[in-house]
């Protein structure tokens, strides 16, 4: 199957095709997320060895990571402690349940099913080394490493997460009751809410998926930032668990390992070829960006980037 050239015109076509879909809405259960422009639709692609291309239908502004931030403790702990230790804290199996499922943890715990679920990310946050401020410095260190720059925490979103995060509190206390939380509940949740509340511009989101696409090497300098083993494990988890109970549908349509967030960001990886980020805050009931998926499917078809196609 022949592929198109990767051009700004192609990205513009993908955005305009996605704009036709009016389904979904902003995630209003985190009040600050409801205040964004729900028509914002954007895409950026970094093909290895080529310049970054991006297109947006509206002026861009910083958007919080939300669940794309779950990549931070996963990758950081993999690098520092290794896979064997990480898998003592969390499993790597698709759950078939929504991202904040309590039932799944009750029935199949004490280990959360995978690091992409809220319970899994909370469990990993409790394993961040240090106490208090040391743990926040650990987060800052890994944000710097995985985004190639510092990011800021949006204080309004952080406060909103803390104020409304009762389901996450329930998950944390359930983990604690099963002896699978490595630290204090409140301190762990502060870390979790913080990583969800980091905010980034579209172009700032592109470094991490491009790093993973390039086997852990900085796409500009060639410096080995992450081990190839960490990249392999991370991409496998993204491919099987990155969009919760919609991951199978996503992989059938796009063939790209990806990680979504309810803010509207989805990062995707074409191993050996490209890093991608799409943005649209119109999300479905599963917490995934509807227009984002339309853009990723269109890009995959246009570029012949589905993993299952030769």
From Swiss-Prot:
Keywords of this protein's UniProt record, alphabetized? Hydrolase
A molecular-function term among this protein's GO annotations: glutaminase activity
* Disulphide bond pairs: none
Catalysed reaction(s)? L-glutamine + H2O = L-glutamate + NH4(+)
Which residues are involved in binding substrate?
Answer: 67, 118, 161, 168, 192, 244, 262
The family database entries (InterPro entries) matched by this protein are listed as: Beta-lactam/transpept-like, Glutaminase
Q: Known Pfam families for this protein?
A: Glutaminase
The processes (GO biological process) annotated in the record are:
glutamate biosynthetic process; glutamine catabolic process
Hydrolase in keyword set: yes
Reading the lineage from the top rank, the first entry is Bacteria
* The keyword RNA-binding is assigned to this record: no
Q: What is its EC number?
A: 3.5.1.2
Q: What class of enzyme is it?
A: hydrolase
Q: Which residues form the signal peptide?
A: none
What HAMAP family does this protein map onto? Answer: Glutaminase (MF_00313)
How does it associate, per the subunit comment? Answer: Homotetramer.
UniProt cross-references to PANTHER family, sorted A to Z: GLUTAMINASE
What family classification does the UniProt entry report for this protein?
Belongs to the glutaminase family.
The protein, known as:
Glutaminase
């Amino acid at each position: 199957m022949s592929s198109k050239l990767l051009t700004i015109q192609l990205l513009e076509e993908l955005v305009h095709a996605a704009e036709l879909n009016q389904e979904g809405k902003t995630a209003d259960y985190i009040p600050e997320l409801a205040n964004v422009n729900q028509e914002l639709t954007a895409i950026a692609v970094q093909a290895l060895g080529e310049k970054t291309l991006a297109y947006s239908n509206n002026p861009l502004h910083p958007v919080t990571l939300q669940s794309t931030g779950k990549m931070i403790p996963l990758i950081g702990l993999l690098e520092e402690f290794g896979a064997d230790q990480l898998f003592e804290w969390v499993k790597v199996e698709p759950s078939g349940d929504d991202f904040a499922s309590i039932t799944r943890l009750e029935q199949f715990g004490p280990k959360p099913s995978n690091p992409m679920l809220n319970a899994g990310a909370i469990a990993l946050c409790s394993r961040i080394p240090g106490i208090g401020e040391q743990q926040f410095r650990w987060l800052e260190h890994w944000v710097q490493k995985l985004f190639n720059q510092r990011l800021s925490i949006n204080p309004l979103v952080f406060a909103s997460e803390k104020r409304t995060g009762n389901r996450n509190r329930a998950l944390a206390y359930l983990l604690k009751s099963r002896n699978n939380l490595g630290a204090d509940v409140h301190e762990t949740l502060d870390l979790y809410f913080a990583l969800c509340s980091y905010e980034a511009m579209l172009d700032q989101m592109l470094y991490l998926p491009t790093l993973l696409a390039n086997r852990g090497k900085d796409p500009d300098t060639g410096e080995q930032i992450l081990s190839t083993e960490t990249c392999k494990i991370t991409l496998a988890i993204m491919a099987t668990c990155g969009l919760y109970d919609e991951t199978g549908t996503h992989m059938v349509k796009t063939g790209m390992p990806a990680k979504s967030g309810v803010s509207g960001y989805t990062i995707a990886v074409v191993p050996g070829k490209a890093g991608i980020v799409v943005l649209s805050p119109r999300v479905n009931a599963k917490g995934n960006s509807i227009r984002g998926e339309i853009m990723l499917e269109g890009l995959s078809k246009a570029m012949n980037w589905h993993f299952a196609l030769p």
